[in-house]
Every structure is written in structure tokens, then in C-alpha cells.
Amino acid sequence: MTSAPIPDITATPAWDALRRHHDQIGNTHLRQFFADDPGRGRELTVSVGDLYIDYSKHRVTRETLALLIDLARTAHLEERRDQMFAGVHINTSEDRAVLHTALRLPRDAELVVDGQDVVTDVHAVLDAMGAFTDRLRSGEWTGATGKRISTVVNIGIGGSDLGPVMVYQALRHYADAGISARFVSNVDPADLIATLADLDPATTLFIVASKTFSTLETLTNATAARRWLTDALGDAAVSRHFVAVSTNKRLVDDFGINTDNMFGFWDWVGGRYSVDSAIGLSLMTVIGRDAFADFLAGFHIIDRHFATAPLESNAPVLLGLIGLWYSNFFGAQSRTVLPYSNDLSRFPAYLQQLTMESNGKSTRADGSPVSADTGEIFWGEPGTNGQHAFYQLLHQGTRLVPADFIGFAQPLDDLPTAEGTGSMHDLLMSNFFAQTQVLAFGKTAEEIAADGTPAHVVAHKVMPGNRPSTSILASRLTPSVLGQLIALYEHQVFTEGVVWGIDSFDQWGVELGKTQAKALLPVITGAGSPPPQSDSSTDGLVRRYRTERGRAG
């Protein structure tokens, strides 16, 4: 499959048309948009799978959307999308296919990439995971002393940690086998020590998640965890209390893990896209293979929508392009994600890696410098906590911060309110709807004065509005719905990356710091005075640290 040249999107007529359009409507208030088009609240919506998405409170018109779609076609979005699904090596800097979508293909699908039957390979690993977790959950698999495993500890970092942590918390209601999970990622020993403090080695299983089985933080923590285990149960216990998610059989075997209990994945799966691969083993132990299959099916619903829906009604495309509209034409630096669900409290952190590691690039895929800002900064907290922390800036600050609100109609937890007029979940969601409304429409000085506010206070209470947001609603938080939400953002990232002309699937920016850390470790720990560093700041910091540690400075 041949590829069209990657255009410098800012040098195209489509970009110029959007720039002129922004000059025309950029200062128009959402109050005016709704007055001019009263039906937009019903019509600027899209339903896909179990998600209802309202994008009417964005500073766009139907003309804006048409121009953004034209921009996407100018960037060959449909062609690039089809190449990704077909297994073309669109990760050009590493010469790799990008096939996280293959992880959720049904068993009867067909996809051969580089001569390999990808679907067969994926389901072989899923079957192995299912067989193992069935044994663990039933009690057939026991620890070295014969006791059942009650806690799994996932040791990983980056995509091997952020995804499992987020999903475990989000799907806690679906844990059904008496097994809990904990997660260790930070090389700071406080992380591991706190995690193990109240655990029984005899009932603890460790999952070491590292593709190469050489990731510094992961192997450092895994080695310390093995020492904790063997101090209590002896060296022979390792094979009953450790399994691996890796592709390096030799190093896994050297560690003491039976390679029959090693679950693999592929170089066409990036870490931040891997929670639905064997990296999700800890999740399957907790929720079981059937719920995990529902999770994968949710991803696939959005995959098919993204692959087949016209761009004009394609949810990830529309949301990705709207994000780009704010980044490149309004100068917005960030997007906040506000789940009105405490179980999704780690979802913004998960999206930080997904979006910022993917699109935080200053070089286009062809090696030339980018000509526009790339990479939205994602952040957020669950509602209503955020309302009492940073919503002040959203409402009355000088920075434009588009917001994504996520909520559910049917709670998995609920309690009545003291007034008896509804439930706590109703109270939560009334805040959801109120915040999107106030962000959009605000309250004018005249309205505030009419309330009897003293004249000298009126200006301080003005709510300017015109703050854009997306509202995403689903019936309830299920494994499938969570998969749909994740895939919705995955494909937004792809959409933006294609338009910007960057490679969204490499992450060279994280490598140099790791290399430098390895070089500095002997400098800060070695005997004798350390060699001078190449800059006076690092040199001074190293010497200060060594002095505080009682080493020669």
C-alpha cells in the first residue's frame, strides 16, 4: 500500500480557510451560537456504542466542522487510518506496524501482517491468559505453601502500570473471585515498601511486566520483591509466586520464572496502547476472562466506528479535530478531563500518557520541523472534587481550557440524600450539567446586578462563559463502556497526529534521560570525589546530594 506524501498542513488552502474562518467567528459567544441555531443542542451530537456525545457547547458552527473535515482529508486521514488497520508500518521512525486495534479483533477476523497471522497470535495469548487466570481464580493454582493467592502485585512502569491501575479502579465492582490487585511502578523504594507492608508472601503473586525484561525501574522493583519473597519462603517459591509479561524468555528464565508462565506481546503494541494486551493480566485475574472479553469488545465497537463511519459523523475524528481547532487557532494549551465518577479518578492520568507521549513531538514524520503547535496537555480530576480546586480558573481565568465531562446515568454505588429528594448520584450529575451550562453561557453583569449584588462586587462575580466543553454520557460504567471510552481517545490522538504530520507511535523523548541516569548512577554512588559534570548546575546538585548522603563531595 503506497502512501501519499505527508503535507505541511499549515501550508495548505484548507489551513488558510480555517484561519480566515477563525478571524470571522473566533470572538462569537456560545450564547450567540445557540441563539442563531437553537437546534444545535440536539443536532451537534453523536451516538456510538453506549456513548452519547454532545459537542454542541463548542465554539464551532456547521461551517467550522466542514472546514475541519476538509483539513482532515487534506492530511489524508482516511488513507492513514486504513493503513493503520491494515498493518502498514506507519510508525516510520521505528519501522513498525501500529496494531493495538488487532488486540481486540474477534476470533473469526482475518489479518495477516508481515506474513504473520496476527489474529491467531492474539487469541493464543488471550487463551493462555484465560487458562492461567481460571486456575488462579478457582484456587487450582496455589502458592508454594499451598495457600490460595489473594493478592496480585503488578510490577511495571509507564504503559505497563498506568493502564492497569486505571482500569482496576474503574472496574472494581466487577471483581468476583476474592483477588485484589496492587501496583508498583516507581523506583522510589517507598512505593514497593508501602505496597508489601501488610501482604502475606504465601498468598501474593507478582506479575512482572516488561517487554524486554530489562526496564531499569521494573527489574529493580522485581528483584527487591523477589528478595522479600525468598526471605520468607525460600528460592524455590519464586516459580509459584512470579509470572511475567514479556518477550525475553532467557531473562525471564534467569530470573527464576517458569517460561510456561510468560505471556507475550508484540513490537506493534506501544506501551500506552497495551492495557488490552497481556499487560492486562492483572485485570483478568481480578475480573475474569469473560469481563475482560467484554472490555475488549468495547474497544472494538469504537474501532469499527472509527474505521467505517463518514468523517462528518465519526466521533473520534470530530473530537480530535475540535481539539486541534482550539490548540492551533485559539492558542489553547491544555484540555481538562472531568469524569463525574470517582471510579474514573485515574482516567485523566492515563490519558496524559496516551495523548502527551503520542503527540508531544516537534519533528514531523518526514524529519522536518513541525510548523504548528502539537500535543494537547491533558489533566483533570473527578467531579465534584475539581470544582473546589481549579474550576475557578476554568470559569473566570484568562486561559481557554476546553473540558471533557464524562458521566453515567445509572450508578454502581448510590445513597439517598438527607432531603429525600433524590440520590447522591443525582446530586453529582446535577453538578455535571450545571458546570457545562455555566461554562458555556456564564452570567452577565446585568444579570448579577439584577440579583441585588452591590455595584462594587458585580465585576468580581461576572461569569463570562464561552468556555467550551464536550459532554459524554453512558448508561453505566461497564467493562465494555470503559473500552469504548479508551478507544474514543486513542483515535482522537491518531486524528490529531495525522493532521500535524507527526509519528504518534514513537517516544524518543523519554530515552535520553534514562541513558543519562545510568551514566550518573556511579557518579553519585562511587567512592572518592566525583568527576566534574558538563554544567555547573548538575555538578553542584550531584555534589550536594553526595554530601547529604555522607559521600565525598
Swiss-Prot record:
Stated role: Catalyzes the reversible isomerization of glucose-6-phosphate to fructose-6-phosphate.
Active site: E357 (proton donor), H388, K514
Subcellular locations according to the entry: Cytoplasm
pH and activity: Optimum pH is 9.0.
Enzyme's top EC category: isomerase
Similarity remark: Belongs to the GPI family.
Subunit structure, interactors included: Homodimer.
Biased composition, class Basic and acidic residues, residue ranges: 541-553
UniProtKB keywords: Acetylation, Cytoplasm, Gluconeogenesis, Glycolysis, Isomerase
Region ranges (Disordered): 524-553
In-chain residues carrying the UniProt-annotated modification N-acetylthreonine: T2
Protein's GO biological process: gluconeogenesis; glucose 6-phosphate metabolic process; glycolytic process
Pathway(s) this gene product operates in, as recorded in its UniProt entry: Carbohydrate biosynthesis; gluconeogenesis; Carbohydrate degradation; glycolysis; D-glyceraldehyde 3-phosphate and glycerone phosphate from D-glucose: step 2/4
NCBIfam families: PRK00179.1
Keyword Transcription regulation appears in the UniProt entry: no
EC number assigned by the record: 5.3.1.9
Regulation of protein activity: Activity is decreased in the presence of the PGI inhibitor 6-phosphogluconate. Does not require mono- or divalent cations for activity.
SUPFAM superfamilies found in the cross-reference section: SIS domain
Protein name: Glucose-6-phosphate isomerase
GO molecular function: carbohydrate derivative binding; glucose-6-phosphate isomerase activity; monosaccharide binding
GO cellular component: cytosol; plasma membrane
